[in-house]
Structure formats: C-alpha cells, structure tokens
C-alpha cells in the first residue's frame, strides 16, 4: 500500500515522503496513529500544493531578507559608551546594545544572536557588524560608538 508520511517515522520515512509499505503495517500502525495517510490522488494533489506553498514561503523569506540587507547597509546605528585614555572603552558594546539601539533609532527588530559580534566593540569609532539574516543572506550594519 502506498502511503504519504505525515510525520517522521524512524527507519521508514520522513514527513512528506511517499512510500510503499505492507498493508498490515499501514492499517494497524501508520494510519491508526496518524503517522501517514493513504496515497490517493486527492491526497497527492494536496501534498503537491503544500510543497509549492512551502517553496513560495521560502522564496518570500529570502526576498524579505535581501530587502532587509539593503536597508541595513544604508543605515548607521549610534551607540554611546564610557571610554578612557586613547578611545578605549570601559567594558565593551555588546550585540544586545546594538540590537536595542537599532530598534530604538530605526524601528527594526533583529535578534541579538544574529549579530556576529563575538567579543563586542571595544573602541570608539565606526565598526561594521555582520548580521546573519538568512542562511544565504548576510548583511552589514554600520555601528558608530561615541563617548557618553
């Protein structure tokens, strides 16, 4: 019997996969526990429509990330921090502070974990911060650190 898996089943198939399985296994386990549905023409059409919808969503997500990248690269975020001799900061400017400043100044919310700022910004001036917006899209945000 051909079935379409609705969930991952260890050793048998992944979600959305169409496979031939024994009739007893399909009726007594997969269909009963709603792990799969029978591969009827209607269900196959529904699966195709769902795959197209998911693909369209992924494409839209990528386009949104590209647009946000262009927007970010045109912006500049200003952050103030206390500094000592020679422009060295007391402590550092973290990705959380940069994300908060971006939200306050430009109304753009980006998760601090998407900013690639391992040790923070430790000096006054301009710094380019890489921001991972999507698997394939990495933008750059210009951060200007000034003395408080």
UniProtKB/Swiss-Prot annotation:
GO biological process, one term: translation
Name used for this protein in its record: Large ribosomal subunit protein bL9
Single GO MF descriptor: structural constituent of ribosome
Organism of provenance: Macrococcus caseolyticus (strain JCSC5402) (Macrococcoides caseolyticum)
SUPFAM superfamilies given in the database record: L9 N-domain-like, Ribosomal protein L9 C-domain
Paired cysteines (S-S): none
Annotated Gene Ontology cellular component terms: ribonucleoprotein complex; ribosome
Role of this protein: Binds to the 23S rRNA.
Keywords tagged on the record: Ribonucleoprotein, Ribosomal protein, RNA-binding, rRNA-binding
PANTHER family: 50S RIBOSOMAL PROTEIN L9
Similarity comment text for this entry: Belongs to the bacterial ribosomal protein bL9 family.
């Amino acid at each position: 019997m051909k079935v379409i898996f609705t969930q991952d089943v260890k050793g048998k198939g992944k979600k959305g996969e169409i496979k031939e399985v024994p009739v007893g296994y399909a009726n007594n386990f997969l269909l009963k526990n709603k792990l799969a549905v029978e591969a009827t023409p209607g269900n196959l059409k529904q699966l195709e429509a769902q795959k197209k919808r998911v693909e369209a969503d992924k494409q839209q997500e990528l386009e949104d990330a590209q647009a946000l990248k262009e927007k970010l690269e045109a912006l500049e975020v200003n952050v103030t921090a206390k500094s000592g001799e020679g422009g060295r900061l007391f402590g550092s400017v973290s990705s959380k502070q940069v994300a908060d400043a971006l939200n306050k100044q430009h109304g753009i919310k980006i998760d601090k974990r998407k900013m690639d700022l391992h040790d923070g910004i430790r000096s006054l001036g301009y710094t380019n911060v890489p921001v991972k917006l999507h698997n394939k899209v990495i933008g750059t945000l210009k951060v200007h650190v000034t003395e408080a």
